Amino acid sequence: MPKRQDIKSILIIGAGPIVIGQACEFDYSGTQACKALKEEGYRVILVNSNPATIMTDPGLADATYVEPITPEVVAKIIAKERPDALLPTMGGQTALNTALSLRRMGVLDRYNVEMIGAKPEAIDKAEDRALFREAMAHIGLETPKSRLANATDIKDHDRKSHEAERSALKAKLSGDELDKALDELENQWNLGEGDRKQRYVNHAMAIAAQALDDVGLPAIIRPSFTLGGTGGGIAYNRSEFFEIVGSGLDASPTTEVLIEESVLGWKEYEMEVVRDKADNCIIICSIENIDPMGVHTGDSITVAPALTLTDKEYQIMRNASIAVLREIGVETGGSNVQFAVNPENGRLVVIEMNPRVSRSSALASKATGFPIAKIAAKLAVGYTLDELENDITGGATPASFEPSIDYVVTKIPRFAFEKFPGAEPTLTTAMKSVGEVMAIGRTFAESLQKALRGLETGLTGLDEIEVPDFDDNGDGRNAIRAALGTPTPDRLRMVAQALRLGMSEAEVHEACKIDPWFIAQFKAIVDMEARIREHGLPADAENLRMLKAMGFSDARLATLTGKRPKEVAELRNALNVRPVYKRIDTCAAEFASPTAYMYSTYETPFVGAARSEAQVSDRKKVVILGGGPNRIGQGIEFDYCCCHAAFALKDAGYEAIMINCNPETVSTDYDTSDRLYFEPLTAEDVIEIMRAEQENGTLHGVIVQFGGQTPLKLAEALEKNGIPILGTAPDAIDLAEDRDRFQKLLMKLDLNQPNNGIAYSVEQARLVAGEIGFPLVVRPSYVLGGRAMQIIHSESMLQSYLLDTVPGLVPEDIKQRYPNDKTGQINTLLGKNPLLFDSYLTNAIEVDVDCLCDGKDVFVSGIMEHIEEAGIHSGDSACSLPVHSLGTDMVDELERQTGALARALNVGGLMNVQFAIKDGTIYVLEVNPRASRTVPFVAKTIGAPIAKIAARVMAGEMLDEAIAAYGKKPNPRNLKHIAVKEAVFPFARFPGVDTLLGPEMRSTGEVIGLDTDYALAFAKSQLGAGVDLPRDGTVFVSVRDEDKERVLPAIRILSDIGFKVMATGGTARFLGEQGIVATKINKVLEGRPHVEDAIRNRQVQLVINTTDGNKAISDSKSLRRATLMQKVPYYTTMAGAEAAALAIKALKAGNLEVRPLQSYFET
């Protein structure tokens, strides 16, 4: 079936900011879809608010809207662009929910827009729990016993009543009078949303109480139309049940939850399926979760293909998954179907399905090489699978050829519980991981151990771990069983530790329900470790190769034998035990693959020597090291830089080689670089690739500055191995990190720095803190994302930091050296990585500056003014570009100081400087001579691909020459528009965690607001970040004394546009003296009714609150948590409060307009 000719333009909805449950995988799928549809000649319109994505590059779609993804804003885009079709399956849950809202609002019908890829009926049937259950029963497939709790009946009644009122007005009035009456009716309807929602929740809770009697405990609660299991969980008792149901009903846009019988401990599988209009169906990949049911699949360790199914079981599941797609009605694209299997009797039940490209689709694509998103986009416009070629095999096979793989893929999630003190590190059906790593090996053991070291959490393999409450002298088995029975990020290591401590495989299985086959595999690794400890390293190549084929890294072998990793590497090289590289080709080597998508293995065939499929070219080449698994502080922004480096180097005639291990990213797409190695980013793995590539052609160098801290840590090892590093020298990067050397540089350049000190021990830390005085900022050296960075207000806080926080940074090898000596552990760590202390500059303005330098010339690409005060991590701060309150002289001086620093460090490529301005004096906070997370934001705002320019400079071009390759040199100080970047946080995922921001980064993603007006740009940034700014209602104000004068402009604006004001005693008194009427309300500590009650009763629509001192911060924690749970916008800085007030005023005036990114740079 040829492509459709009746469609000319297609709107793609992206996924928006990176959040837990929806990450880079949708940039990957969206980018593939944009390219695939443009390739077919369609006009592509894209909406996505995330500036850090490749898909929002202005050259990818024909019209790129970096606007908030809300139904109202997307409706404006549709009205402006009039697309023929809407593709909602590439942007995760955000895109699906937005598309369904547009349909319900009548927007799609009004503008005659057809939904392609997945019909609305199919989405409803898959996402609506009741419809899905009925559909499965219709085709004879079981689902777990369940009951729905919702408020459908009273919702329908409310909607009909509202429509009746509208009809009555239309019958009675006309013209302007009718329009005014309808607007007033809608306004009243919208104001009553909170009350209606509460009624719906109460009604659904009553149904849930009845359902509990039917389903029993434990019960699994699954909210409808949510992302990554948001709001759901497992209830083991009645109080947990009602708490989780309440949370789920609140999270569900349809106020509906499914209450399901427990299938805890059952085996979990996923099938990735693609179907076309001609009913051709192929299974791309089967995926098996090592963790049993009860852990969200995004938080589970998974393998592909499924390893514990018999062929008969696989065929049953394969047929069932195809039947599910047919029944749901998915006929143009990919879907993933999740199953649970009872290991006792083989009973198979369907858990759910996603009628769209998903996180699992990205994993399946990278695991097999099959480009699911690209094929799905083409199926959506009418093609059938047999009409499309498989790119990986160079067209030797059609897309209808079902992929087969001759290796094992392991995915392990990465968590960030350390960023959220107080969060329970227990895994449930609500997703909590922030990233993932994927590894490929010829055996499960090789794949698993590669994935473990690829996580970059300090693991070298299946490392030892301490069992909580384990007693060597008594019976420790109960402690082990308890640890095994609780799903945590470390459970896999706990299984290995239980086997080391003598538990049988059967006992371990009984405690954790992980399949016995996997436990036997872990036992084989543990037994081999014991042999290595006893006998040392083998002296012959055959046995050493056998250990490497089991996935043992040089570092792990060194730990087991008491040697250094360098000694193991030397022995390995002397015995010529080296990896070979195999290709991922979708066809298990049945056809030759021209696509250089590779992984390493030490496994040898039964006959003859191992054969490498690397086919190293004779070209001049540059290697780019990626960022590894996403984590807070190091995410999609760095992947964006790596992709741009690959694009630029290809433009400049180099062979671009990418090394990365993150399955979610565009950088690990097979066509981003010329050659892709899907490998862990460790010194051992990277150096082996370099050696392989040096066998032919010329290795011009390696780029370590684009992937965040991950590749920077490898710079020293690469340099020692004679591998040229492009751009800024590692010594200059070290100078910027080394407090003593950096201080001398600033003194030489006559630049200011906050009063500071450095501590190499616990005792020295106390002395340095005493000299600087409180408040102060403390952080470990050589970290990214402000890891373990804190503002310290008192001696007791410092003591807590030293004895509670710092021990969490101590690596395993130091802990093992000083098993019962916490101070010894800390001092050993600080001896190499000291603590850095800075005086905390209160009420200072923080500024981020990005620049490019070729060692001589400097181009300042962006000066960003933070809306939060100094002391909030720059990655968590909202900021504007260009600056909005700094004068020309100040900007001139910031440019001068940036240029001086770049030249002094002899920067080749990108550099980021963070300044603080207090009382007219500029202080240098830190310098990062590498890519920063603001690079994509700056690039989108000024209209220049600065990461591409930097890559060419690093390869040897002069700055002006590299800029000229991409058009005219922009002038960031002369923009006719303003951009505001806002951070997005995962606090709702971590109950009990304080939402107060500080110097440790906690955001997972970001959005951009772009407009010619600052207030509207800020408004768009808030809407994009999910903050629904109120147009009417009550603002609650409580600020410290020093902020009372500064809060007045914001309160006057809000009061003038009709907001009521509520305030605590001191603030209410002050506002009254200034002529502003404010209703007094109690603080939480002053007795009830207090402000928290008002927030929970939906009497407050906006909060402005600042606190000072440790006790006040602690006392106001419950207030911050209440605003989060009730989704009330909350501002903690005066600049933020004023920006919000101006934004609300602009929104109320109805001034919000949408424009494509390209239009801002048209001359």
Swiss-Prot record:
Gene3D superfamilies linked: 3.40.50.20, ATP-grasp fold, A domain, ATP-grasp fold, B domain, Carbamoyl-phosphate synthetase, large subunit oligomerisation domain, Methylglyoxal synthase-like domain
Residue limits of the ATP-grasp domain? 185-381, 743-955
Extract the ranges annotated as region (Carbamoyl phosphate synthetic domain): 615-1026
Residue segments, region Allosteric domain: 1027-1163
Identify the InterPro entries for this entry: ATP-grasp, ATP_grasp_subdomain_1, CarbamoylP_synth_lsu, CarbamoylP_synth_lsu_oligo, CarbamoylP_synth_lsu_oligo_sf, CbamoylP_synth_lsu-like_ATP-bd, CbamoylP_synth_lsu_CPSase_dom, MGS-like_dom
| Region called Carboxyphosphate synthetic domain, residue ranges | 1-456
Q: Kindly list the positions annotated as binding Mg(2+) 4.
A: E926, N928
Q: Bound how, and how many: what does the cofactor note say?
A: Binds 4 Mg(2+) or Mn(2+) ions per subunit.
Report the GO terms under cellular component.
Answer: cytoplasm
Query: Which positions does UniProt annotate for Mn(2+) 3 binding?
Result: Q914, E926
Q: Which cysteines are joined by disulfide bonds?
A: none
Give, as one word, the top-level EC class. ligase
Q: Where does Mn(2+) 1 bind?
A: Q338, E352
Residues annotated for Mg(2+) 2 binding in this entry: E352, N354
* SUPFAM superfamilies assigned to the protein according to its UniProt record, in alphabetical order: Carbamoyl phosphate synthetase, large subunit connection domain, Glutathione synthetase ATP-binding domain-like, Methylglyoxal synthase-like, PreATP-grasp domain
Q: Which GO biological process categories is it annotated with?
A: 'de novo' UMP biosynthetic process; glutamine metabolic process; L-arginine biosynthetic process
Annotated ATP 1 binding lies at: R129, R222, G228, G229, E261, V263, E268, G294, V295, H296, Q338, E352
The annotated region (Disordered) lies at: 148-170
The cofactor required is: Mg(2+); Mn(2+)
Binding positions for Mn(2+) 2 per the UniProt entry: E352, N354
Tell me the residue numbers annotated for binding Mg(2+) 3.
Q914, E926
Report what the protein is called. Carbamoyl phosphate synthase large chain
Question: What's the encoding gene here?
Answer: carB
